Amino acid sequence: MYSIKMRASKNGKHISGAERIVEKEKIEEVVKDLTKRALNHENGTPDFINIKVEKIVGEIEYIDHLPIITIPCKNIKEARKKAIEILINEGIPKEIILQAFEIIDRGGMRGAALLNLKGERLDPDKERGVRVKNIDVSESLKNEILTKNLGTERTVDAIAIASKVIHLGVLAELCTSDNKNYTTGYVATKKGYFRITNLKREGDPGGRVFFIKDDRNIKKLIEKLENKPCIIR
């Protein structure tokens, strides 16, 4: 199996990224698909596209996906109230949740901010954040999401990240899309992947925050988030 990673930017600013884990025979097809995706992104046409193909060394872990729950909300106020409610139920203080919203509303990070329950940033590079890599979803899960109207192509990408991070012991995740016109975001916990409509305003940037328990070994967690190969099924 091979990992294929795509990253696209313009004037040094991140536009889009995607990743797949595939058999050798599918490399050419997937590289073409990811290139097309980079060139046709709503955030603009990139002046730099990087595609990296690597043979996976070591065992791939297969992880069951989080249950997918969609919560329709009329506006950002209602959506954020619901997100806060879900996160408080996981034991996260409200002031820390509001701090997380401030981080994602600033945008600009390629990865996720790591925030403990004291409000301390744990990611080593505050500009970059921590990127969850070496992930994909099974074809059967992708087809189920798209054919049963459980979500969109963006849901397919997001469920991979959310399921991996929760499996590895992250307490919860809060995310809004860096696609400026896509306003549905999500909260992920061990109880599920909660798609919440109108979690940000159209045109606003997006971001991602992982809430971390204070007793976690951060170095070990980051290493697994970035390097442990996982396929979500």
Swiss-Prot record:
Keyword list (alphabetical) reads: ATP-binding, Biotin biosynthesis, Ligase, Magnesium, Nucleotide-binding
NCBIfam families recorded for this chain? bioW, PRK01322.1
Asked whether the UniProt record includes Magnesium among its keywords, one would answer yes
GO terms (BP aspect): biotin biosynthetic process
Q: State whether it acts alone or in a complex, and with which partners, per the record.
A: Homodimer.
User: Could you tell me what this protein is called?
Assistant: 6-carboxyhexanoate--CoA ligase
Where does the sequence pass through the membrane?
Answer: none
Write down the InterPro entries for this protein, in alphabetical order: BioW
Provide the reaction this enzyme catalyses.
Answer: heptanedioate + ATP + CoA = 6-carboxyhexanoyl-CoA + AMP + diphosphate
Molecular function, one GO term: 6-carboxyhexanoate-CoA ligase activity
**Highest taxon of the lineage:** Archaea
Protein family membership: Belongs to the BioW family.
Q: What does this protein do?
A: Catalyzes the transformation of pimelate into pimeloyl-CoA with concomitant hydrolysis of ATP to AMP.
Asked if the keyword Glycoprotein belongs to this entry, the reply reads no
Which pathway does the database say it acts in?
A: Metabolic intermediate metabolism; pimeloyl-CoA biosynthesis; pimeloyl-CoA from pimelate: step 1/1
A family per Pfam: BioW
Write the Enzyme Commission number(s) for this entry.
6.2.1.14
Which cofactors does this protein require? Mg(2+)
Q: Which gene encodes it?
A: bioW
| Enzyme class, spelled out | ligase
